[in-house]
């Protein structure tokens, strides 16, 4: 995939969180502590495999016999570690990731997690300037207040929550919400704490809604 994408492929690795999804596929879903242990062990192996180590791997959870990892990637494949954990997630990201995708949240939480991520990276001898910090959230936005209201109604329906619940949660967690002016304030805060890019988790794939969301973001960026 990385070769076909001309080096644009990025590998996102995580603990898993949606238990029902694991149940449906018959995949074990151990407790969070165990899942984090499994994640770290898998990251150690993945790093070695991607760097050309064909000696196999022997760990507590994973045992892989010696085999060549072929075809080899044309270049390094960036690893993304993301989530909203305040300690373990930024710690693992600082050790192993090329991109820390911290889930959107209040400024203080973002700032603390990003600081820990950088501290761990430096302690591990990594060049922080070469590591990326991104975020992700589902936008509830519109070019006008009326359009924001329509987006809010659609989000409430998609997520099976009330409009008040959506509005309160989005504002409380500093997700992208509102008109371009309001969105610009959130983007400015993200920029201030060190976030460089955002992945938009679109709740509607209808072309008009998608295009309006993109236009809101464009106008917001111009206001910063």
Predicted regions and their residues:
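Active-site-adjacent structural elements that line small-molecule/cofactor binding pockets in enzymes
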Residues: 2-224
């Amino acid at each position: 995939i990385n070769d076909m994408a001309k080096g644009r492929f990025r590998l996102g690795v995580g603990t898993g969180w949606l238990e029902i999804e694991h149940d449906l596929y018959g995949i074990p879903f151990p407790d969070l502590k165990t899942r984090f242990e499994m994640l770290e062990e898998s990251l150690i192996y993945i790093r070695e495999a991607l760097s050309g180590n064909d000696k196999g791997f022997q760990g507590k959870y994973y045992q892989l016999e010696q085999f060549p990892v072929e075809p080899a990637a044309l270049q390094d494949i960036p690893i993304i570690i993301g989530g909203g954990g305040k300690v373990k997630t930024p710690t693992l990201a600082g050790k192993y990731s090329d991109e820390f995708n911290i889930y959107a949240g209040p400024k203080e939480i973002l700032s603390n997690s990003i600081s820990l991520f950088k501290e761990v990276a430096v302690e591990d001898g990594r060049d922080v300037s070469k590591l990326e910090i991104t975020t992700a959230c589902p936008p509830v936005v519109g070019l006008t207040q009326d359009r924001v209201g329509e987006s809010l109604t659609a989000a409430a329906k998609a997520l099976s929550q009330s409009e008040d619940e959506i509005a309160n949660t989005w504002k409380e967690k500093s997700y992208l919400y509102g008109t371009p002016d309001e969105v610009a304030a959130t983007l400015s805060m993200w920029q201030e704490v060190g976030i460089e890019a955002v992945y938009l988790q679109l709740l509607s794939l209808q072309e008009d809604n998608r295009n309006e969301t993109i236009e809101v973001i464009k106008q917001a960026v111009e206001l910063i």
